[in-house]
Design a protein with these regions (language model features):
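Catalytic glycan-binding domains that act on GlcNAc-containing polysaccharides
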Residues: 1-121
Length: 121
């Protein structure tokens, strides 16, 4: 049972409120918070949510990953603030944890893209 300092649960570190929201969107009426510890549920919810965020932010991976970590509300605020956004693109992330998270995800993405270049075409 993996729980972050912030209370995110399971393999894909989903916050309980987000889990309930996802369950509602997926029509999972009997969802319980403890199901976030079940890998099959957690991965399905996390993948669905990441796809939702990618769709919400026009396929921009950096922005979607930032929203996965910091929440879409925070990211929308940053996108509307010239201190953090240039030309509708997230230029600077004010939360250090989120900025580091986005960098780690991008490094992993680049690494796996190279590693599986032949399979990905």
């Amino acid at each position: 049972t993996v729980v972050s300092r912030a209370g995110a649960k399971g393999l894909m570190q989903i916050m309980p409120d987000t889990g309930f929201w996802i369950a509602e969107k997926l029509g999972e009426e009997d969802f319980t918070e403890d199901e976030l510890f079940e890998p099959k549920v957690n991965i399905r919810f996390g993948c669905w949510y990441l796809k939702y965020l990618l769709d919400s932010f026009s396929g921009n991976r950096k922005t979607a990953v930032a929203a996965y970590n910091a929440g879409p509300g925070n990211v929308r605020k940053w996108l509307n603030d010239e201190n953090y956004s240039k030309g509708g693109e997230l230029d600077r992330i004010p939360f250090k944890e989120t900025a580091q998270y986005v960098e780690r995800v991008q490094r992993a993405y680049d690494k796996y893209t190279k590693l599986y270049a032949n399979e990905l075409g």
